[in-house]
Design a protein with these regions (language model features):
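Glycine-rich adenosine-cofactor-binding loop
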Residues: 1-17
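Short active-site oxyanion
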Residues: 1-2, 25-26, 53-58, 168
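Short hydrophobic segments within beta-strands
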Residues: 3-4, 29, 60, 101, ...
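Conserved Rossmann-like nucleotide-cofactor binding loop
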Residues: 9, 34, 194
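Short amphipathic alpha-helical segments
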Residues: 14-16, 69-73, 112, 183-184
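NAD(P)-binding Rossmann-fold cofactor-contacting core
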Residues: 20-37
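Phosphate-bearing ligand-interacting subdomains
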Residues: 34-89
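Structural signal for interior beta-strand "rungs" in well-ordered beta-sheet cores
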Residues: 81-189, 193-196
Length: 198
């Protein structure tokens, strides 16, 4: 397996892979020519990327829009990364390119899209539906039947009550408590959540 993006998030992905699988990480591609290694994994210039020899790839980029752009520009066999200490229901579905990190919970009948991040200690309860490129930050909690639109970012420790719909490319600030639906392309913060004009 190869990784793309030599960031702090990459370190967490490496740790998750090593915790839960015998897959060997062959290297990391990045456009920062000054980086040589991360956690003893060699870093290669993006210009040397050859998709013909890459059997499996994973994008280690926290920024949702950048992750989407990379996935659209690089057609590859994308794997999933699931930490050994994540708790995932056998009735949940998780699509390619998604990471579920340490102590995260994905419960029964939850559906997780492509290239999502379910970060450390995050909770995705029963029947939630996450579209592609969503990031659920550490210790954020989604109650049952929550829907999250493409590219949305749910901040650290945010809480979303049951049955709420969050639009596409929304930002929910850290610690925010969401008790009503949120429209596309908006920024909400506070308890209860209120909209901030971008």
């Amino acid at each position: 397996m190869y990784l793309y993006g030599a960031s702090g998030h990459c370190k967490v992905v490496i740790d998750s892979i090593e915790s839960s699988t015998s897959k060997k990480i062959e290297g990391i591609f990045d456009d920062n020519i000054n980086l040589k290694k991360i956690l003893n994994i060699p870093i290669f210039k993006y210009q040397t990327f050859d998709k013909q020899r890459i059997k499996e790839l994973f994008i280690c980029v926290g920024n949702n829009s950048v992750r989407k752009l990379i996935s659209e520009n690089i057609k590859a066999n994308y794997g999933t990364v699931i930490h050994a200490n994540a708790c995932i229901s056998k009735y949940a579905s998780i699509n390619e390119g998604t990471a579920v990190l340490a102590n995260a919970v994905v419960n029964a009948s939850a559906k997780i899209g492509k290239h999502c991040i379910i970060n450390t200690g995050a909770i995705v309860e029963h029947d939630c539906e996450l579209e592609d490129f969503v990031h659920i930050s550490p210790n954020a909690s989604l109650a049952g039947n929550v829907k999250i639109g493409e590219g949305s970012h749910i901040g650290i420790g945010a809480q979303i009550i049951q049955g709420i719909s969050i639009g596409k490319w929304v930002t929910i600030g850290a610690g925010t408590v969401v008790i009503r639906d949120v429209p596309d392309n908006s920024l909400f913060v506070g308890n209860p959540a209120r909209e901030i004009k971008k």
